[in-house]
């Protein structure tokens, strides 16, 4: 089987079939034992030849010690992530525009226009079909100039203009009916009017049972009003260290000096009623009430630059959309496909958070190996496709 980069999602679907046809996923690797490296390459994948200098394809022998990708999960989570192939929309001609994910990014204000671009564009680079940015009018023209691939809506207007405000609320609510997931927070800011819009957005989205990703200043809103999300499980929060500490305090959870086991994140998930927590740090921790804590420790970049968290929110958002689409497909199928293993709702949310984190870290690493100290978040966007291939292939191995 020869698969070009253009057909890599078809390849993942094919490998998923192969995995189901064998007694155990590891038999895929055993079945290839005895063939040459080149034969195995052609049988499994043909990866892009444009990897940065010094970065080896995972199918070549003698990988570079700092770029070799290995799954970082404990065995239960590694087995779980193999199920993720089932969630990826197939590229087999059966879908029409929008059926691989319609993403909404709520953010973008007078002072912050880059963040919603990073989030929305990252979602497209991972494989969603349509990405909408809902922003403040003063930010819309600027964001439109960044990319023609984004659809930008200047709905977050001031209530000081009541007629326009009411009209924009109506248009925004109509747009929500077409989306699979809403990422709230990138470039939102803490201005009272923008925070009020975020509150209205969360309340409306929850009524419509939309999948949610909350980042940046949407978490600031949640610190002030934690009851907004309490009891709603269809959400992932992506706090950094400072944001996480604020959320703990808002939920009356006593912080601990050392928390590398994810127990505080689990407590936060329980306090908020079951949403998922992706706690960002040197090791990313993923916690959800009723599930084991997952740790993501694959190599990222030592360079910290603004926008990486926004890229993460867009990637996680795409996986959340694929989660919703997966369960919609399952409900429409009369009987499950014989090669597929069932995925529970709790498992799907863990998969979305973990793989969003792994792909972010991997594209950051690839960009850093190419550009070093000069790397910026904009450089990461071009590596999302390669990072996706590397991460997903890593989860076919023992």
UniProtKB/Swiss-Prot annotation:
The keyword Endoplasmic reticulum is assigned to this record: no
A GO MF term: ATP-dependent NAD(P)H-hydrate dehydratase activity
Enzyme class: lyase
Cofactor(s) this protein requires: Mg(2+)
Cellular component aspect of the GO annotation: cytoplasm
UniProt keyword terms in alphabetical order: ATP-binding, Cytoplasm, Lyase, NAD, NADP, Nucleotide-binding, Phosphoprotein
Amino acids binding (6S)-NADPHX: 187, 240-246, 310
Domain annotation YjeF C-terminal: ranges: 80-391
EC number from the UniProt entry: 4.2.1.93
GO BP: metabolite repair; nicotinamide nucleotide metabolic process
Reaction it catalyzes: (6S)-NADHX + ATP = ADP + phosphate + NADH + H(+); (6S)-NADPHX + ATP = ADP + phosphate + NADPH + H(+)
Compartments, as annotated in UniProt: Cytoplasm
Binding site for ATP: 280-284, 300-309
Highest taxon in the source lineage: Eukaryota
Family assignment from sequence similarity: Belongs to the NnrD/CARKD family.
Function according to Swiss-Prot or TrEMBL: Catalyzes the dehydration of the S-form of NAD(P)HX at the expense of ATP, which is converted to ADP. Together with NAD(P)HX epimerase, which catalyzes the epimerization of the S- and R-forms, the enzyme allows the repair of both epimers of NAD(P)HX, a damaged form of NAD(P)H that is a result of enzymatic or heat-dependent hydration.
Protein name as annotated: ATP-dependent (S)-NAD(P)H-hydrate dehydratase 1
Species for this entry: Puccinia graminis f. sp. tritici (strain CRL 75-36-700-3 / race SCCL) (Black stem rust fungus)
């Amino acid at each position: 089987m020869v698969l070009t980069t253009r057909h890599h999602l078809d390849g993942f679907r094919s490998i998923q079939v192969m995995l189901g046809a064998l007694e155990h996923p590891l038999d895929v690797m055993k079945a290839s034992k005895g063939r040459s490296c080149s034969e195995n390459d052609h049988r499994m994948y043909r990866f892009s030849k444009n990897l940065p200098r010094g970065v080896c394809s995972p199918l070549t022998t003698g990988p570079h010690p700092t770029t070799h990708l290995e799954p970082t999960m404990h065995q239960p989570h590694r087995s779980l992530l193999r199920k993720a192939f089932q969630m990826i929309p197939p590229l087999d001609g059966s879908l029409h525009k929008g059926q691989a994910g319609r993403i909404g990014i709520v953010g973008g204000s007078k002072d912050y226009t880059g963040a919603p671009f990073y989030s929305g564009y990252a979602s497209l680079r991972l494989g969603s079909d349509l990405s909408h940015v809902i922003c403040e009018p003063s930010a819309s023209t600027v964001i439109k100039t960044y990319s023609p691939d984004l659809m930008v809506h200047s709905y977050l207007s001031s209530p000081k203009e009541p007629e326009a405000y009411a009209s924009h609320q109506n248009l925004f609510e109509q747009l929500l009916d077409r989306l699979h997931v809403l990422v709230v927070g990138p470039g939102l800011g803490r201005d009272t009017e923008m925070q009020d819009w975020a509150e209205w957005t969360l309340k409306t989205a929850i009524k419509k049972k939309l999948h949610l990703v909350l980042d940046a200043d949407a978490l600031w809103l949640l610190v002030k009003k934690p009851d907004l999300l309490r009891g709603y499980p269809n959400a992932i929060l992506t706090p950094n260290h400072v944001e996480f500490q604020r959320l703990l305090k808002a939920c009356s959870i006593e912080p601990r000096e050392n928390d590398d086991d994810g127990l505080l994140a689990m407590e936060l998930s329980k306090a908020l009623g079951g949403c998922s927590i992706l706690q960002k740090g040197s090791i990313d921790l993923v916690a959800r009430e009723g599930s084991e804590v997952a740790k993501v420790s694959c190599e990222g970049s030592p360079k910290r630059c603004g926008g990486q968290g926004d890229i993460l929110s867009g990637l996680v958002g795409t996986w959340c959309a694929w989660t919703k689409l997966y369960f919609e497909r399952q409900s429409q199928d009369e009987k499950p496909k014989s090669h597929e293993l069932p995925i529970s709702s709790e498992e799907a949310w863990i998969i979305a958070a973990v793989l969003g984190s792994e792909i972010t870290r991997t594209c950051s690493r690839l960009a850093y190996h190419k550009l070093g100290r000069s790397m910026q978040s904009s450089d990461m966007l071009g590596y999302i496709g390669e990072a996706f291939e590397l991460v997903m292939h890593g989860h076919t191995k023992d």
